[in-house]
């Protein structure tokens, strides 16, 4: 079984033995002859894949009545991976979604680390600091780096922790956020687990 998560810059493949990426501009999807079950947020790639019979779009097998129309398919798959908990996908944007007993309860979107760094930098060169993910949030900051870190990370931490649920971290900055959410589970393959669950529901495997 070959799964693929396609973003704007890469094809991210996963099977039972390995995980690897291909450049979205250079990779030729017709070079793969076996069945590929995929999700895609890249409209031009998705149009190209629609012409290939062995590439199967899993978004067509999602019960969208459980979500909202404009919700990203990558967020949906991460939600499908768990029964209950908070999914924090820390990528270019940070998405936080609540799942209770297999039902999507809602979520919100927060600026990603790089975007927020740029935001502070654009306000003033004096605010160009990396965030301190090991900040003690029980103490008010007494320096600029900790002050911007507290403003950015503290609000997110308190909101996520307030739900009192198990926290699942995924995405490129998950490792950084694991320093903040100490009892969280970091799972870079969470989205693929959701894809497998959709396949089971649709009797595709």
Curated annotation (Swiss-Prot):
Transmembrane segments: none annotated. It catalyses: (R)-pantothenate + ATP = (R)-4'-phosphopantothenate + ADP + H(+). It is found in: Cytoplasm. K(+) binds at residue 89. The active site is at residue 74. Its cofactor is NH4(+); K(+). One of its GO terms (cellular component) is cytoplasm. Keywords: ATP-binding, Coenzyme A biosynthesis, Cytoplasm, Kinase, Metal-binding, Nucleotide-binding, Potassium, Transferase. It holds the Pfam family Pan_kinase. It comes from the Bacteria. GO terms for molecular function: ATP binding; metal ion binding; pantothenate kinase activity. Its main location: cytoplasm. Substrate binds at residues 68, 72-75, 144. Gene3D superfamilies: 3.30.420.40. Its EC number is 2.7.1.33. ATP binds at residues 5-12, 92. Catalyzes the phosphorylation of pantothenate (Pan), the first step in CoA biosynthesis. Belongs to the type III pantothenate kinase family. Homodimer. This is Type III pantothenate kinase. It comes from Sulfurimonas denitrificans (strain ATCC 33889 / DSM 1251).
């Amino acid at each position: 079984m070959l799964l693929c998560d396609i973003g704007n810059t890469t094809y991210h493949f996963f099977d039972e033995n390995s995980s690897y990426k291909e450049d979205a501009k250079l990779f030729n999807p017709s070079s793969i002859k076996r069945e590929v079950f995929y999700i895609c947020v890249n409209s031009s790639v998705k149009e190209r894949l629609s012409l290939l019979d062995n590439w199967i779009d899993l978004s067509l097998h999602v019960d969208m009545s459980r979500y909202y129309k404009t919700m990203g398919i990558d967020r949906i798959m991460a939600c499908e991976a768990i029964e209950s908990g908070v999914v924090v996908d820390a990528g270019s944007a940070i998405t936080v979604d609540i799942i209770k007993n297999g039902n999507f309860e809602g979520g919100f979107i927060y600026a990603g680390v790089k975007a927020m760094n740029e935001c502070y930098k654009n306000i003033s060169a004096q605010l160009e600091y990396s965030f301190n993910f090991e900040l003690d949030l029980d103490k008010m900051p007494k320096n600029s780096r900790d002050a911007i870190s507290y403003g950015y990370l503290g609000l997110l931490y308190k909101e996520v922790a307030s739900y009192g649920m198990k926290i699942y971290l995924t995405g490129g900055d998950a490792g950084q956020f694991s320093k903040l959410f100490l009892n969280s589970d970091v799972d870079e393959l969470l989205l693929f687990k959701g894809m497998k669950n959709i396949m089971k529901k649709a009797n595709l495997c």
